[in-house]
Amino acid sequence: MFIFLLFLTLTSGSDLDRCTTFDDVQAPNYTQHTSSMRGVYYPDEIFRSDTLYLTQDLFLPFYSNVTGFHTINHTFGNPVIPFKDGIYFAATEKSNVVRGWVFGSTMNNKSQSVIIINNSTNVVIRACNFELCDNPFFAVSKPMGTQTHTMIFDNAFNCTFEYISDAFSLDVSEKSGNFKHLREFVFKNKDGFLYVYKGYQPIDVVRDLPSGFNTLKPIFKLPLGINITNFRAILTAFSPAQDIWGTSAAAYFVGYLKPTTFMLKYDENGTITDAVDCSQNPLAELKCSVKSFEIDKGIYQTSNFRVVPSGDVVRFPNITNLCPFGEVFNATKFPSVYAWERKKISNCVADYSVLYNSTFFSTFKCYGVSATKLNDLCFSNVYADSFVVKGDDVRQIAPGQTGVIADYNYKLPDDFMGCVLAWNTRNIDATSTGNYNYKYRYLRHGKLRPFERDISNVPFSPDGKPCTPPALNCYWPLNDYGFYTTTGIGYQPYRVVVLSFELLNAPATVCGPKLSTDLIKNQCVNFNFNGLTGTGVLTPSSKRFQPFQQFGRDVSDFTDSVRDPKTSEILDISPCSFGGVSVITPGTNASSEVAVLYQDVNCTDVSTAIHADQLTPAWRIYSTGNNVFQTQAGCLIGAEHVDTSYECDIPIGAGICASYHTVSLLRSTSQKSIVAYTMSLGADSSIAYSNNTIAIPTNFSISITTEVMPVSMAKTSVDCNMYICGDSTECANLLLQYGSFCTQLNRALSGIAAEQDRNTREVFAQVKQMYKTPTLKYFGGFNFSQILPDPLKPTKRSFIEDLLFNKVTLADAGFMKQYGECLGDINARDLICAQKFNGLTVLPPLLTDDMIAAYTAALVSGTATAGWTFGAGAALQIPFAMQMAYRFNGIGVTQNVLYENQKQIANQFNKAISQIQESLTTTSTALGKLQDVVNQNAQALNTLVKQLSSNFGAISSVLNDILSRLDKVEAEVQIDRLITGRLQSLQTYVTQQLIRAAEIRASANLAATKMSECVLGQSKRVDFCGKGYHLMSFPQAAPHGVVFLHVTYVPSQERNFTTAPAICHEGKAYFPREGVFVFNGTSWFITQRNFFSPQIITTDNTFVSGNCDVVIGIINNTVYDPLQPELDSFKEELDKYFKNHTSPDVDLGDISGINASVVNIQKEIDRLNEVAKNLNESLIDLQELGKYEQYIKWPWYVWLGFIAGLIAIVMVTILLCCMTSCCSCLKGACSCGSCCKFDEDDSEPVLKGVKLHYT
């Protein structure tokens, strides 16, 4: 199969040949393919290393459709293709078939086109008016493998650009086999430049566009400045013989660029290694929102939908009369400057461009408005003031000027809005002999006010007294100009017209010649009503304006309504639709699946409420599917709604949770997906008396937890001027117009720094000096040496004494200290040192070992000798009995003191509680009075706050008015943008610091609480002081914080028990006094909640309350909407720079409605002072219990004497046995029952009813 060519002329390959036409050419088959991640290019020439970069430009969207064009045999696919915003062009080749392109609009000689071709020896680029061939192509002879013809255009003229590369040699022979080369190009025509990017990748494919990622690099930036709407490829035709032609196999693919945001990933070498199309899907947008390729599990707020206006609405009044400016400028005679005249211009169309473009005026200066924008504006009225001055005085006709003319003749206000036009009239108002008809005032008592006119001609005297010239110090106030045609230009006459514009405080009567458009309602549009410009949705309003009212403002002073100047219809202005979107993800490490929450939108309205047709393509996500779940928070798409409840992995809000689970729990598959469900505390049947299962610890282990809590952060300040402007003087001067913003920022930072110091003081002020910790200087990477005590200091006694003595400390009721001083180290003086206390003889309840030995020896001796001393030996038992009695007395009086102290504590505590309650009542009364006053002013204060906060909106209106009227110097515009952007950055930084400071403040408060509850006490809260049940805690200072070392015991083993909050028995409910009821499978027990210690349920550990009826109530079912922040008032700050602008009409309203009542709570304060006094009197005066310390250990001679005494007693006992009748009982020879029998004591114990348990 071949292609036949008609009228073919063979010439050398180096020449452009005459066009020819193909016969029997078949239309190519167009196929659709996916672009995968093709088409990414370097957006600029800036080196970036190891960073993520967001850029918005024309890109080929990822996984978009590209159209494939194929050439083989007589299928020659190079049609004219639309260019649109730009194209992605990829060619899969093996024989260099694609050789170039033609870009243009009409693609003929009626307009310029640009040709980019590879002619096998050079790359040639030309921009001309071409007579293009119908089928532009290169011809190659198959047998020779050489190029023979170049048939691209017949003629070229009006060439404005040409480029020829260095010479090279291209292999143009036909190849067989698979496609080996993938050449990618991106073309975009922007700002008069044609940008060309190129990439190459070796391939081995049979068909289709291979998937993959390859970054294209810039090769051309062509300054062509031509309109490009179409293009076509230039291919190669292969000729097996003369006059017979065919094509080789090749394919190219075309995709269209769109304005899209891409996130590019640069490696350390500045190479783009990965990219994200932010508009591809919700996950891609989420990655761009958080600027990360890896997303953790959670729900994330992404960008709002940004609606693009669908059109422009321009509405001006129905005025057709032209303004009579000619009557003003072409008047035959002008008045003198002191008697200037004014003409009111209204109800007409003003074409200011005629004045602006005229070369007739030597001076044309506008103030407060740009001359080039006058035709776009409307005014209530325009006033034209006219007069004549000399050339040198024209400069005084301006705001803020001084001089004879400005002070005594014609004065403009400082906030003047209008234009000054002046032109030389020497040919009209000057003569060769002098024209003295024009006068000016040169003397006056006091300066004129703006637009004040004084036409009097009363003689002037410095003292103000009447006089008649030519008397001394008496002058006529007017002087003649005397215009001569021969004088210099500074003394020549100039006619002046001052146009003053009255802003729209009334219906517009003077407008520019701008044509009105149709009114578009219920769509996002750019509007211009009498010069009021903005963007919003226009809807019919129910408001009723007064005839003179043109605009309406809300409570925040934002323009929210307008009168249509053509129809007088009242229209409401609302912002274009913005819909909040959240993305739920299980984390990119788990899955790329996401769900999308369209906030506050019904699922039935998702496609319309967000105005998908008006969304900008640069940043857009929209998801639909079968898994649609309507929630109170909005429409959730992409998550499967299930009734089963899981652990709440991702809280969405409004009672909805999401998790990533295996769906096999619901169906017989192993696929995982995002499931959404309604959070629940249990089924409806799970009422108070239902059985539930709890885990109770049965064994524990000691755990040490380190907890770091920040209480401060690094102090920062900002060199605002250097940060924003660097060394630029111009920027610094412009920054002055922003007032004290920088000072306020640093003031906020200083406040944060002071708060950090306060946090630190408050936390560490609770660390007591008496607190001791073990010698542990380093633990867990933290240094504990700052709070650890020094090594133990030596005690009062020496080491040897501590070795020989034991120390015992007792509570002293008041007699033990005297006893110790009396006793000294002589234990034998025990009874002698007995003390008197409240009429009783007392001894300390303390017996040392040597005292016990002495009294025991006396007792045994008295008992043993009683038989043979006829009872006299029993007297030795008296010391034992006396000291026992005295010691019981000592114990008794000590217990009595303790009891009395406890009684005093209870009484005084109860008294203090009553005083505290009374103080709380008094405080509540005082606060009630305060609340009443505050409530009375609430509405007025709310109104005032809204009016004050609305100033920022009014400022925006002022700026919009100024921007719509003024032309700025480009340099100042750029500097102002820089300042605004960096000020916003600084404000964001300070806001972040304030948020962080709030977090630090909360952390410091929590640290102070833990210092009190964990360090200075033992917390009963589980997991509050470490993990588990708290034992003790140690604090340690750390950088910007405090470290707690919590010692806890944590459950190591647990058992599950069935439990119930109460047990119903015989119609009554029994509740545990402490602990919980558990069921072990056979019986119910009561046990502690934190440790399994079952006890039998008795009336001692339960109490009865109420009946078995269950009352179920909802404590709180309130869902709070997010608060809308009020804008801060910058009125005082900006009044310095924006004064007397009438268009925004900033009005703080009538604040006289505030009730300025004085709160009188003096009685309550006096009562609080009295209560405080009573509380001070509640100090508990306890009887002092001193501490008595005694070191006890028998010395060696006591032991020796004790042993000797025992030996003597034994010997005496043996002697007695030998001397009495009991001697023979030892051998059993006689009865000695009365001597050797042991009596059995069957008496009851003294303490009856007391059972002793030994464990």
Swiss-Prot record:
Changing S239L: In strain: Isolate GD01 and Isolate SZ3. Keywords: Coiled coil, Disulfide bond, Fusion of virus membrane with host endosomal membrane, Fusion of virus membrane with host membrane, Glycoprotein, Host cell membrane, Host membrane, Host-virus interaction, Inhibition of host innate immune response by virus, Inhibition of host tetherin by virus, Lipoprotein, Membrane, Palmitate, Signal, Transmembrane, Transmembrane helix, Viral attachment to host cell, Viral envelope protein, Viral immunoevasion, Viral penetration into host cytoplasm, Virion, Virulence, Virus entry into host cell. Changing K1163E: In strain: Isolate GD03 and Isolate SZ3. GO terms for biological process: endocytosis involved in viral entry into host cell; fusion of virus membrane with host endosome membrane; fusion of virus membrane with host plasma membrane; membrane fusion; positive regulation of viral entry into host cell; receptor-mediated virion attachment to host cell; symbiont-mediated suppression of host innate immune response; symbiont-mediated-mediated suppression of host tetherin activity. Changing Y778D: In strain: Isolate GD01, Isolate GZ50, Isolate GD03 and Isolate SZ3. Changing M144L: In strain: Isolate BJ03. Belongs to the betacoronaviruses spike protein family. This is Spike glycoprotein. It comes from Severe acute respiratory syndrome coronavirus (SARS-CoV). The lineage of its organism: Viruses, Riboviria, Orthornavirae, Pisuviricota, Pisoniviricetes.
